[in-house]
Design a protein with these regions (language model features):
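OB-fold single-stranded nucleic acid-binding module
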Residues: 24-26, 39-63, 84-91, 125, ...
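OB-fold and OB-like beta-barrel modules that bind single-stranded nucleic acids
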Residues: 31-42, 74-81, 129-141
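Short, small-residue-biased leader/transition segments that mark boundaries at the very start
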Residues: 2-7
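Extended, charge-rich, solvent-exposed interface segments
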Residues: 62-113, 159-173
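A generic structural signal for short beta-strands and their flanking turns/coil linkers
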Residues: 12-14, 30-34, 51-53, 72-76, ...
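A beta-strand/beta-hairpin structural motif
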Residues: 9-27, 106-126
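Solvent-exposed residues in well-ordered beta-strands and their adjoining turns
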Residues: 19, 41, 81, 101-103, ...
């Protein structure tokens, strides 16, 4: 499909955390093609000025890959924990920012910024905090310029670019 072709062309830099045991089992070389299966994690890094949400992939399995193209696929289910924010890009495209809380073991949750596009953006903008959703997308990285009192600084944002999303339940269900 055209949407999956876009995913094949986009280059994203993703931070991966790997246990030493997994690395010891497989010698890595720079620019090696890898298959990483794992969980997306988030935490607030409070060091330095301003809070910064850090998004990583915690590798459960890692292996060398002989696939002819890279595949960046994420499947999530969780709960909207902030009101959706519908906006228009400078190119005139509708996008909606969502914050998804994804529960994991031991009462912890990961908070993952997600973006829907076009007609889906307009639809998801109407959803309420507490709505349960399931989605498919990719973990994307994008550069942006942050203007500070001391000048402009280039930063990288990590977010889930949503390909498909469905509402599992509304807050009052």
């Amino acid at each position: 499909s055209a949407a999956s072709d876009v995913y094949k062309r986009q280059i994203d830099r993703v931070n991966v955390v790997v246990r030493e045991r997994l690395l010891a089992e497989m010698p890595l070389e720079e620019s090696a093609r890898l298959c990483v299966i794992g969980d997306v994690r988030s935490f607030n890094n409070r060091r330095g000025p301003g809070a910064k949400l850090v998004i990583t992939v915690f590798a459960r399995d890692i292996s060398l890959s002989d696939e002819p193209y890279d595949r960046n696929l994420i499947l999530l289910s969780g709960t909207l924990c902030k009101p959706p924010n519908l906006r228009t890009t400078p190119m005139g495209r509708d996008i909606c920012d969502l914050m998804l809380a994804v529960n994991r073991h031991y009462g912890r949750s990961d908070y993952l910024p997600c973006i829907t596009w076009g007609a889906r953006a307009c639809e998801t903008a109407l959803w309420d905090v507490g709505t349960r959703v399931s989605l498919e997308g990719r973990l994307q990285s994008r550069s942006y310029i942050k203007v500070l009192d001391t000048g402009a600084v280039e930063r990288t944002a990590f977010e889930v670019s949503v390909l498909d999303i469905c509402r599992l339940s509304a807050p009052d269900d």
